[in-house]
Amino acid sequence: MNTADFDFHLPEELIAQTPLEKRDASKLLIVNRETGEMQDKHFHSIIDMLEPGDALVMNDTRVLPARLYGQKVETGGHVELLLLKNTSGDXWEVLAKPAKRLKVGTRISFGDGRLSAVVTEELTHGGRIVRFEYQGIFLEVLESLGEMPLPPYIHEKLDDRERYQTVYAKESGSAAAPTAGLHFTKELLAEIQAKGVHLVYLTLHVGLGTFRPVSVDNLDEHEMHSEFYQLSEEAAATLRSVKENGGRVIAVGTTSIRTLETIGSKFDGQIQADSGWTNIFIKPGYEWKVVDAFSTNFHLPKSTLVMLVSAFAGRELVLDAYHHAIQEHYRFFSFGDAMFIY
């Protein structure tokens, strides 16, 4: 299969620039992958698609305010850093602008000097390893000085940075939000739990690779980015019990899917507690191990996420659903509407 097989025309005005006032007021396109039937609903209706004894699996990662603006100590020149991942202790892999002037040993100061960094290693493509120096707790300093790294297709300023976090975000470490979870409110989750559905949390820290376009024609040549994931013993035990009792594992978003299917692939279809790095690429032809249904937002043309959804529901049905969503003026991408596929 070729990358072009997953292309579609999206009018630019359908790219959501801001979140809706109410999280669960977004639209929900429900798709039955067996019959091809589609229903236009609102997100709150997801509760009607869940049965007592099912598990709803969510990614509790928290987005870091990972964009930092500073000055070089020696020259006062402006520097922008985007934190990608914590490599060890206070050392981080970052994307730097302008990278060519940031040699090993360059010192950078941020804000009122409460945070500084020194470049310790040069990587390719504008990447650097920097070591941070600060007073107090790093994440608290970052919360006060950093800005949210919104996706490249969002041009509006975000008034409330909590709107780019899920209501259950807990484990700091992502460069982007697991956006399928943005539609849930605490009230809706309480209603779902009261219905007898198990709420299960895992962690996958979303990397910037999630926005990287596929640059090859042949899908077999595409290399996926790696992301850190973790599933606790308690969560794994709940999911095993759900499966044994005939319930469904319903994933919220592609990050939850990739974590569950990584674990299922690693343990021969079994669900075990695990943590590590995954670069799983789920595309048509993939044999599903764990996930029975899922919710997800509408994704970019030719992206690996459209390919993942197509692996579950079939390419033609997914493209039909996307064309339906475009005709019905659904909102696309991170702050957009959602679909539920079962």
Curated annotation (Swiss-Prot):
Keywords of this entry: Cytoplasm, Queuosine biosynthesis, S-adenosyl-L-methionine, Transferase
Keyword Cytoplasm: yes
Molecular functions (GO terms): S-adenosylmethionine:tRNA ribosyltransferase-isomerase activity
Coiled-coil spans in chain: none
Subcellular location: Cytoplasm
Subcellular location, principal: cytoplasm
Gene Ontology CC: cytoplasm
Cited SUPFAM superfamilies: QueA-like (SSF111337)
Domain of life: Bacteria
GO BP annotations listed: queuosine biosynthetic process; tRNA wobble guanine modification
Residue spans crossing the bilayer: none
Pathways per UniProt: tRNA modification; tRNA-queuosine biosynthesis
Catalytic activity entry: 7-aminomethyl-7-carbaguanosine(34) in tRNA + S-adenosyl-L-methionine = epoxyqueuosine(34) in tRNA + adenine + L-methionine + 2 H(+)
Family annotation (Pfam families): Queuosine_synth (PF02547)
EC number: 2.4.99.17
UniProt key word Transferase: yes
Gene3D superfamilies cross-referenced by the UniProt entry: QueA-like
InterPro entries reported for this sequence: QueA, QueA_dom1, QueA_dom2, QueA_sf
Record family assignment: Belongs to the QueA family.
Function: Transfers and isomerizes the ribose moiety from AdoMet to the 7-aminomethyl group of 7-deazaguanine (preQ1-tRNA) to give epoxyqueuosine (oQ-tRNA).
Summary of subunit composition and partner proteins: Monomer.
Protein known as: S-adenosylmethionine:tRNA ribosyltransferase-isomerase
Lineage, broadest ranks: Bacteria, Bacillati, Bacillota, Bacilli, Lactobacillales
